[in-house]
Amino acid sequence: MDSQNILARENELKPQQDSASNISIITKALQELGYSWSDVCLDNVDYRQFKYEDRVRWTTYIQPALAYPMIHRALSQISRNKTAATDYVESKGYVTPKSVTVTTGNCQHSELENLLEKSQALVVKPVYGSLSRGVTRNISDAQILHNTVKAALLNDDCVIVQQQFYGDEVRLVVVDGVLAAAVLRQRPQVIGDGEKQLRQLIEQENAQRGLISDTMVSYPMLNEINCDMPNLNLDSVPYAGETVVLGYGSMIANGASVYDVMDVLAAGYKHMSEDIASSMGAKFLVVDVITRDPHNFTDYCFLEFNTSPVLKLFYSCRDGQHADVAPILANAIHKITK
């Protein structure tokens, strides 16, 4: 092997490497198990190799996603394909959104219009995509729907149109057949007290956000950008106990709040995620669902799979009660690479 094509730097973080990146978080967890590591560059792609007792046990991409050794090829393919993932979960008897897959040259006009008639709103997104890339929500007009699909097909050969389900996202992490973590990604919201105007409640929420510390992701202030729910009346006075959802964001950067809900999650979510992972032979799988109430397994909908989640999310619970998944993943890596 040509040594000029390999650049190795053992156990030394590159200056530009984010300490909250996936590779940094998993590296720290593996080091605590006694692993050493080195970076190599092969054909202009950066990799990291992990050694245990002088034997290379795992090699992974450094960016953007990690190639976990627990992920087999079929699982990776199904997870990346939102249509395949939805079909698989539906075949297991769990709730999925009604959907239509559209490809270049086959726009399925009648099926799309039929789906729109049966839905409050639709969402358009690429079949292959992550981090909300290319996602358009709240489509309720036929012409807007066709224009959105047409525009989406300029960037992707295949898009999926689904019924939009309103609720908050829950990320379920299954490792070695057992639900290991569950975090709620709660949309930006405030709770009324029967006295304050909505604008005052938002100001109060922002004051609380300013006190949040010990999170890998910083919480932004709520503003007109992340409070994008239509028809918000800032002068209104929500009644005591009323939850006012302010926006659609499911990421912290878009106003969402993250909480560890492992101890309060309804048992049905645990059974569902473990059942799906087991049936796929998955040693590691992330199942994302949308729910109106994580305490009840009655009003939910499957969203998508993930095989390389953003780890810093689990260490950004706003109350400081984080979901410590890195050691769990490190132990799974250690076990499967023996």
Question: Across the structure, where does each feature detected by a protein language model lie?
Answer:
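Alpha-helix-centered segments that form part of catalytic cores
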Residues: 77, 231-260
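Active-site nucleotide/adenylate-binding loops and adjacent lid/helix of ATP-dependent enzymes
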Residues: 63-66, 72-218, 266-271
